[in-house]
């Protein structure tokens, strides 16, 4: 009798995706982050579902409903902080996952890469809407500033913003629709993740060497399931340390003040994981130019496969490209720091230089390094 996991129509799909999947024998811990993102997504959906049971999406009660969750609901405080800090963990894993794709040339799997970019945009949209829901000062003003960026679109901009707001300012209609979208988007993300995996399993995983590993595969279970469990344990440990010891470390104190349309906070800034894009937006004095730079800072990932000039896929054996990659990482950290600083003398110029460097490294330096390294191969 055939094993049920190989014959049952449903279990067979799971078997081919997570158990008998042929995986390269040499993939490192950088390949753990895909499964960690899956765990983060499931955690966010579960905690979010429980929060939605007690949350009310009305401007008069939203803030107090979040307070009620933390004070009166059994274990409400831990569910709320797991959800808030779980988002931070999600983005840490997401950035590392994208970085690993860049470093090892995984972007040559075009369908997988493009679905990944759509996923990145969707997750960012979901996180932004989630930040608006507690209806604190930063929620309200963050929503006002970011949605207002659409008014930079010529001709239809103002109408578009008012259509999204459902009125002439961020108000009850905006909060209600943001809650509806914030609830539905994770399930759309889940569907996209399945498509992402479907395309990945068409080609098989990449590996650190960047060369085909068809002749040297091992089953996913038990080798990589055990390896992934170690990643899960480390992720959950870090998340619990954050939640139980300093749950507000990554949040903004202004969000503990109820939203007040008549009082603007001194520094409006998004959550830490959007600061790099926010810094790029602020570094351009023109509104439309800033919005375009903001969108391109993420969308630039889509043209990276076209900018690949090297004869080698991975950066493992390409020291010049490695230098450019780590310079890019340092530049993104600089942008993240600048995004959280006030708009005044030293920070403005640092932000502008870091923004120029960001686009230069991707569009100019990495392709040139690839060509130089191709010449090294002739020696």
UniProtKB/Swiss-Prot annotation:
Keywords: Electron transport, Heme, Iron, Membrane, Metal-binding, Mitochondrion, Mitochondrion inner membrane, Respiratory chain, Transmembrane, Transmembrane helix, Transport, Ubiquinone. GO terms for molecular function: metal ion binding; ubiquinol-cytochrome-c reductase activity. SUPFAM superfamilies: a domain/subunit of cytochrome bc1 complex (Ubiquinol-cytochrome c reductase) (SSF81648), Transmembrane di-heme cytochromes (SSF81342). The chain crosses the membrane at residues 33-53, 77-98, 113-133, 178-198, 226-246, 288-308, 320-340, 347-367. Pfam families: Cytochrom_B_C (PF00032), Cytochrome_B (PF00033). It comes from the Eukaryota. It is found in: Mitochondrion inner membrane. Heme b b562 binds at residues 83, 182. GO terms for biological process: mitochondrial electron transport, ubiquinol to cytochrome c. InterPro entries: Cyt_b/b6_C, Cyt_b/b6_C_sf, Cyt_b/b6_N, Cytb/b6-like_sf, Cytochrome_b, Cytochrome_b_C_euk/bac, Cytochrome_b_N_euk/bac, Di-haem_cyt_TM. GO terms for cellular component: mitochondrial inner membrane; respiratory chain complex III. Its cofactor is heme b. Heme b b566 binds at residues 97, 196. Its main location: mitochondrion. Gene3D superfamilies: Cytochrome Bc1 Complex, Chain C (1.20.810.10). It is a multi-pass membrane protein. A ubiquinone binds at residue 201. CDD domains: cytochrome_b_C, Cytochrome_b_N. Binds 2 heme b groups non-covalently. The cytochrome bc1 complex contains 11 subunits: 3 respiratory subunits (MT-CYB, CYC1 and UQCRFS1), 2 core proteins (UQCRC1 and UQCRC2) and 6 low-molecular weight proteins (UQCRH/QCR6, UQCRB/QCR7, UQCRQ/QCR8, UQCR10/QCR9, UQCR11/QCR10 and a cleavage product of UQCRFS1). This cytochrome bc1 complex then forms a dimer. PANTHER family: CYTOCHROME B (PTHR19271:SF16). Heme 1 (or BL or b562) is low-potential and absorbs at about 562 nm, and heme 2 (or BH or b566) is high-potential and absorbs at about 566 nm. Component of the ubiquinol-cytochrome c reductase complex (complex III or cytochrome b-c1 complex) that is part of the mitochondrial respiratory chain. The b-c1 complex mediates electron transfer from ubiquinol to cytochrome c. Contributes to the generation of a proton gradient across the mitochondrial membrane that is then used for ATP synthesis. This is Cytochrome b. The lineage of its organism: Eukaryota, Metazoa, Chordata, Craniata, Vertebrata. The gene is MT-CYB.
